[in-house]
Amino acid sequence: MITPDFEKTGGLVPVVTQDAATGEVLMLAYINREAWETTLASGKATYYSRSRKQLWVKGESSGNVQIIKEIRIDCDNDTLLFRVEQIGGAACHRGYRSCFFTKVEADGTGRITQERVFDPAEVYKK
């Protein structure tokens, strides 16, 4: 069985997440061994939150779940590519389709290139 080399990377492996239908890059996150095993077993993208220090099933709060369509591993076994079906239209916790919604202009300023899919204040209120 192919497994990411968690030992080489200090226990966390980066994951680039891409829309399987369009090729759009949605986000970058990290997984540990438990998140890897949970993702394989459930078919839903499960990551490890470095700030909360716990597993995080993408979309469990917002409903914007990522269904795994394909997983690829790089030649060094230390980076993954999740190709997903993005349910609900937004991968970013700030309400955008992609976490890469800001274009950096030549002068160093930022320009938002996407419309918000949802209002985070409404979705994540406690």
UniProtKB/Swiss-Prot annotation:
One of its GO terms (cellular component) is cytoplasm. GO terms for molecular function: magnesium ion binding; phosphoribosyl-AMP cyclohydrolase activity; zinc ion binding. Homodimer. Binds 1 Mg(2+) ion per subunit. Binds 1 zinc ion per subunit. GO terms for biological process: L-histidine biosynthetic process. Its cofactor is Mg(2+); Zn(2+). Keywords: Amino-acid biosynthesis, Cytoplasm, Histidine biosynthesis, Hydrolase, Magnesium, Metal-binding, Zinc. It catalyses: 1-(5-phospho-beta-D-ribosyl)-5'-AMP + H2O = 1-(5-phospho-beta-D-ribosyl)-5-[(5-phospho-beta-D-ribosylamino)methylideneamino]imidazole-4-carboxamide. Pfam families: PRA-CH. The lineage of its organism: Bacteria, Pseudomonadati, Thermodesulfobacteriota, Desulfobacteria, Desulfobacterales. Its main location: cytoplasm. It comes from Desulfosudis oleivorans (strain DSM 6200 / JCM 39069 / Hxd3). Zn(2+) binds at residues 75, 92, 99. The keyword Transferase does not apply. Belongs to the PRA-CH family. This is Phosphoribosyl-AMP cyclohydrolase. InterPro entries: PRA-CH, PRib_AMP_CycHydrolase_dom, PRib_AMP_CycHydrolase_sf. It is found in: Cytoplasm. It is an enzyme of class 3 (hydrolase).
